[in-house]
Amino acid sequence: MYFPRIRDVREDSDKTQKDIADLLYISQQQYSLYERGEREMPLSYLYALAKFYGVSADYLLGLTDRIT
């Protein structure tokens, strides 16, 4: 699945794919696959990103427009 908000919040935070990959202890290439929707992102990564960005997982998934 492709969730453009994952990319959008990263760019809004002025972070690179490498920055976020390092946070998740994965390669930039692996993170890129998740961001483009070519691989399913594990829930543990999704929750880590939500916590890091201070938004809800539902927001990242596009299920709500409420940030928190």
Predicted regions and their residues:
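Recognition helix of helix-turn-helix/homeodomain-like DNA-binding domains
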Residues: 25-40
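Short, basic-rich loop-to-helix N-cap that marks the start of a DNA-contacting helix
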Residues: 38-48, 67
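Short, charged recognition helix plus adjacent turn
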Residues: 51, 61-68
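DNA major-groove recognition helix of helix-turn-helix/homeodomain DNA-binding modules
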Residues: 25, 44-59
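Short basic helix-loop element that most often maps to the first helix and adjoining turn
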Residues: 4-23, 48
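A detector for short, charged/polar N-terminal pre-domain segments
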Residues: 1-4, 39
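Conserved functional loop/turn residues at catalytic and ligand-binding sites
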Residues: 14, 19, 35-38, 64
